[in-house]
């Protein structure tokens, strides 16, 4: 795992959300201290913190900080303030379900403690936010173990966007088996799509993997077919921002194209995600809201000067949906789901509920 990367955490005093500003990597590693809902909202919206699990963690911690200073004297007034902050943070980005899952979990915690004094409710909210982070770290490693069971030493792996330590609490999702394999001498060869237009693969994945000593080769998105045709790719691993009940999966724009290429070349295509990213209330990928972002991200953001004609129309969706029938398996902390996903995903949640009852 990359050394000294802690993308999202509360400080020891519980007075600030500390994030690494991912818009500056790989040229600079700068930590930001966020203390207000407005700062947390901006960090999520601007991708200073990104990756579905990390967004959920940041939202939970930002919600706690948003009500920590409340002077409400009774529960109803405190709950009113809480709901306002929750709704505001929920508006930061529409696609990653972890954002809404984490905020809903914080509200459930508050309601469980509604008969407690306000200071005790605040402490319970802090503990819940910390628990979300700790659980994600454990899930990362377990996902990595399940995914590693599908691989052999020396394999070539292609990944898209960034689903590593920067996107989660620990090892990541799609990169977790790569890190575990590196620790055990598997010596994987990794191809990282640059992931236009925001270059998460070039800026973040290549950076992470190099920090960990992994053999990584950066490629342009339109080179994926070439490396697959050359026989250099044995498996594709990606993370995701939302899985629908039928297995359709929303992930960074370009993922669907990679899945189609993998199907053509007979390469298994795996999605790695914690169960918090699976939304059984969402029937299919058609029901997932796809975020659209600023045209400038395509035309000029990473260039010394503008690289497209002034006034040209730009379509800039942040995500696309990979159809379930293109996905070989969905790997979670409760096991590996295979088609038909309408059944296997429900089975994962049955296992999860059983594990929670035993805990």
Curated annotation (Swiss-Prot):
Substrate binds at residues 50-52, 93, 200, 251-252. The keyword Isomerase applies. Its EC number is 5.3.1.23. The keyword Isomerase applies. It catalyses: 5-(methylsulfanyl)-alpha-D-ribose 1-phosphate = 5-(methylsulfanyl)-D-ribulose 1-phosphate. GO terms for molecular function: S-methyl-5-thioribose-1-phosphate isomerase activity. The record marks 161 as: Transition state stabilizer. Signal peptide: none annotated. Keywords: Amino-acid biosynthesis, Isomerase, Methionine biosynthesis. Pfam families: IF-2B. Disulfide bonds: none annotated. The active site is at 241 (proton donor). GO terms for biological process: L-methionine salvage from methylthioadenosine. Pathway: Amino-acid biosynthesis; L-methionine biosynthesis via salvage pathway; L-methionine from S-methyl-5-thio-alpha-D-ribose 1-phosphate: step 1/6. Belongs to the eIF-2B alpha/beta/delta subunits family. MtnA subfamily. Catalyzes the interconversion of methylthioribose-1-phosphate (MTR-1-P) into methylthioribulose-1-phosphate (MTRu-1-P). This is Methylthioribose-1-phosphate isomerase.
């Amino acid at each position: 795992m990359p050394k000294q990367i802690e993308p999202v955490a509360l400080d020891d005093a519980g007075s600030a959300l500390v994030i690494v500003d991912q818009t500056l990597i790989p040229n600079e590693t700068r930590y930001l201290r966020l203390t207000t809902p407005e700062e947390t909202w901006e960090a999520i919206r601007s991708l200073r913190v990104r990756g579905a699990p990390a967004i959920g963690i940041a939202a939970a911690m930002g919600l706690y900080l948003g009500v920590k200073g409340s002077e409400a004297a009774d529960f109803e007034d405190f709950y009113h303030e809480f709901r306002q902050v929750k709704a505001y943070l929920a508006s930061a980005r529409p696609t990653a379900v972890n954002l809404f899952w984490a905020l809903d979990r914080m509200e459930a915690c508050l309601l469980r403690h509604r008969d407690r004094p306000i200071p005790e409710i605040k402490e319970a909210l802090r503990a819940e936010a910390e628990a979300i982070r700790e659980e994600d770290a454990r899930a990362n490693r377990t996902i990595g173990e399940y995914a590693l069971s599908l691989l052999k030493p020396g394999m070539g792996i292609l990944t898209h966007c960034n689903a590593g330590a920067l996107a989660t609490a620990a090892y990541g999702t799609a990169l977790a088996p790569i890190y575990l394999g590196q620790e055990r001498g598997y010596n994987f060869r990794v191809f990282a799509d640059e992931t236009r237009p925001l270059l998460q693969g070039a800026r973040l994945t290549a950076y992470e993997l190099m920090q960990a000593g992994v053999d990584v080769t950066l490629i342009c998105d339109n080179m994926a077919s070439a490396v697959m045709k050359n026989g250099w790719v044995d498996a594709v691993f990606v993370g995701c921002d939302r899985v629908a009940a039928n297995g359709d999966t929303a992930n960074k724009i370009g993922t669907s194209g990679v899945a189609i290429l993998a199907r053509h070349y007979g390469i298994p295509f795996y999605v790695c995600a914690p169960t918090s990213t699976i939304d059984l209330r969402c029937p299919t990928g058609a029901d997932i809201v796809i975020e659209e972002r600023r045209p400038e991200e395509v035309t000029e953001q990473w260039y010394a000067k503008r690289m497209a004609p002034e006034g040209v129309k730009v379509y800039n969706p942040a995500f696309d949906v990979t159809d379930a029938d293109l996905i070989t398996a969905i790997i979670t902390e409760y096991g590996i789901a295979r088609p038909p996903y309408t059944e296997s995903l429900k089975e994962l949640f049955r296992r999860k509920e059983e594990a929670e009852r035993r805990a």
